[in-house]
Structures are given as structure tokens and as C-alpha cells.
Amino acid sequence: MIIKILGEGCSKCDEQLKNVKIAIEELGIEADIQKVEDFREIVVYGVMSTPALVVDEVVKSSGRVLSVKEVKKYL
């Protein structure tokens, strides 16, 4: 599983990354977590507001920080 956090280095993006790491640990799954900060790459996903969560190249959420519980639903 490849998980990407899209965002240009904002504090909300860092919080989303933290919640994703916690969710993965609690679920006991393996995943490659990538932080994408390049605006040109973010636009390719059609995301206009960050942070965004992408799981296996599918945008699951954008524009708000998901809780650990919400992240688990998408994994």
C-alpha cells in the first residue's frame, strides 16, 4: 500500500501525516508513506485544498485533517 499526504508543508499536513502513522501502527499494516509537497505533483491529483490523503493513487480526502479513526476507514 502506498499512502501519500499531499500538502505544501503546512502544520495541518504534518498533523495528517502523524495521524496516518498512528493508524498504520494501530492496524498493524505495512505501507509506504510519502509526503508530497511539490505543487505541480499535487495538481495532477486534482486536489485544490490540502492536506489530502491518497491511498494507492486514489484521492480519499482533501481540505481537512482526518482523525486517526477516519484514516483507518480509508486503509
Language model segments and positions:
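Structural micro-motif
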Residues: 46-54
